[in-house]
A protein has these predicted regions:
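P-loop NTP-binding core
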Residues: 1-50, 54, 60, 64, ...
């Protein structure tokens, strides 16, 4: 339980630390309750009509392939009705794809010669739904059979939390920072972890990622400048995914710019208000100027 008594310290530093500890304790208790009984985030089951729609087939076709034994029965069958887990749908896709005469009919991933798509969601404004848009887009793509990697570039770790991991309370593993730091970076594959969502992997973030901003300001490595570090990290795993989505912090710092240099497309969410539209216009003007500087430094965008 969270202590009901007020903090007794008068020192601002100790007061801030005490409030932080109380909030983290409250979050931890809430997650234990929300993700009971095994403290793991999970995905709901899908009805037979939903499963057919996601696979792009008819209900009659689903009954046919079950009757023929082409795909196995789901574990959850109630009153003659089938309910599928996302993992069962993912496995059904692979089976149907192998049996299909049309390549890509059920697993629509990259075709030979197609480059990895890297989409960065970014904006100056906090609260513009960057993280929310990233996770919903990732879920949609994974449910439709794409191999998706989400990369959390925000030290706040909101996207990481949406994937079922509280970065500052229950997670002490490797993060994006460990793969792009200047001293002894680890392979990017060591950072990536599976999520509760089949087809979706995560490169998580913690507050430590903010160190990249400080390090980039004082380091100059001509062999691997700051704006190429995320691109080079993604190149290590590009054959394992169809699409990469990057969630950016609400600023044009070194992390965001490094993500821009790696991206094939930029997505700029904004809310429909004059202040947000004005801020977005300023953001894009500054982003264009920074991209020009990166291009002049030799990067191909």
């Amino acid at each position: 339980m969270i202590p009901a008594t007020p903090s007794v310290t008068d020192r601002p530093s100790e007061l801030a630390t005490d409030i932080s500890e109380r909030l983290n304790r409250a979050i931890s208790e809430h997650l234990l309750s929300a993700f009971a009984p095994d403290n793991t985030k999970s995905l709901r089951l899908f009805s037979a009509p939903e499963a057919a729609e996601l696979l792009g087939v008819s209900g009659q076709f689903m009954r046919k392939v079950h009757g023929e034994g082409t795909i196995p029965e789901p574990k959850d069958v109630r009153a003659g009705r089938r309910y599928y887990s996302a993992q069962e749908l993912w496995e059904a896709r692979q089976i149907l794809e192998k049996a299909s005469r049309t390549k890509g009919r059920y697993v629509p991933g990259r075709k030979e010669g197609e480059r990895l798509q890297v989409w960065q969601l970014m904006n100056f404004k906090g609260g513009s739904s960057k993280s929310t848009s990233t996770i919903h887009l990732a879920h949609y793509l994974a449910l439709n059979g794409y191999r998706v990697l989400v990369v959390d570039l925000d030290p706040q770790g909101s996207l990481t939390s949406m994937c079922g991991i509280n970065p500052e309370i229950e997670f002490d593993g490797l993060t994006v920072y460990d793969a792009i730091r200047y001293d002894d970076p680890v392979p990017f594959s060591d950072v990536i972890m599976p999520t509760y969502f089949p087809g979706l992997s995560l490169a998580p973030a913690r507050l430590l990622l903010s160190e990249f901003e400080t390090e980039s300001a004082v380091n100059s490595n001509p062999d691997q400048p700051f704006f190429l570090r995320i691109r080079n990290a993604l190149a290590q795993v590009e054959d394992q995914y169809d699409i990469v989505l990057m969630d950016s912090p609400p600023q044009l710092g070194f992390l965001t710019i490094s993500g821009m240099a790696a991206a094939t497309s930029l997505i700029v969410p904004l809310t429909p208000s004059m202040l947000d539209v004005s801020s977005t216009a300023q953001f894009l003007e500054l982003a264009g100027a920074y991209m020009g500087v990166i291009e002049d430094a030799g990067a191909e965008l």
